[in-house]
Amino acid sequence: MLAERDTLEKNYCELFEVPVDGRSNDGDAMLLQEALRGKDNEIRMLEERLAVSSKNVERLNDELLGANLEANVLGQKLQDLQQEHDKLLERWMQRVRVEVDKMNAQLE
C-alpha cells in the first residue's frame, strides 16, 4: 500500500512539477503570453501580405487576360492581312503573265 502511494506520488510529481524554490510560474506565463502576442502579430502581418499578394495576382491575371485577348485580335488581323496579300500577289502575277504573253505574241 505504501509502495502504491509512493508510485502515485512519483507519477503526480512527474506530471505536475511543483517548483522547488516556491516561485510561481507567473514569469513563465508572462514570457509565453509575450511570445503568443508576437506570434499573433506575425500572423496578422502575414495575413496582410497574403491579402496584398492575392490582389496583385488578381491584377496580373486581369492584365494577362487582356494581353491574351489583344494577341488573339492581332493574330486574326495578321491572318486576314496575309490572305489579302496572297490574293493581291496572285492577281498581280496573273496580270504580269497576261502582259508577258502579249509581249511574246508581239515578238512572234
From Swiss-Prot:
Coiled coil regions, renumbered to chain: 28-94
Protein name: Autophagy protein 16
GO annotations of cellular component type: Atg12-Atg5-Atg16 complex; phagophore; phagophore assembly site membrane; vacuole-isolation membrane contact site
Record's bilayer topology term: Peripheral membrane protein
Record has Coiled coil as a keyword: yes
Oligomer status and interactors: Homodimer. Part of the ATG5-ATG12/ATG16 complex. Several units of each may be present in this complex.
Pfam families hit by this protein: ATG16 (PF08614)
GO molecular function: Atg8-family ligase activity; identical protein binding; protein-macromolecule adaptor activity
Biological source species: Candida glabrata (strain ATCC 2001 / BCRC 20586 / JCM 3761 / NBRC 0622 / NRRL Y-65 / CBS 138)
Described purpose of this protein according to its UniProt entry: Stabilizes the ATG5-ATG12 conjugate which is necessary for autophagy. The ATG5-ATG12/ATG16 complex is required for efficient promotion of ATG8-conjugation to phosphatidylethanolamine and ATG8 localization to the pre-autophagosomal structure (PAS). Also recruits ATG3 to the PAS. Involved in endoplasmic reticulum-specific autophagic process and is essential for the survival of cells subjected to severe ER stress.
Family classification: Belongs to the ATG16 family.
Protein location: Preautophagosomal structure membrane
One GO BP: piecemeal microautophagy of the nucleus
Main location (coarse class): membrane
InterPro entries listed in its UniProt record: Autophagy-rel_prot_16_dom
Entry keywords, A to Z: Autophagy, Coiled coil, Membrane, Protein transport, Transport
Keyword Secreted found: no
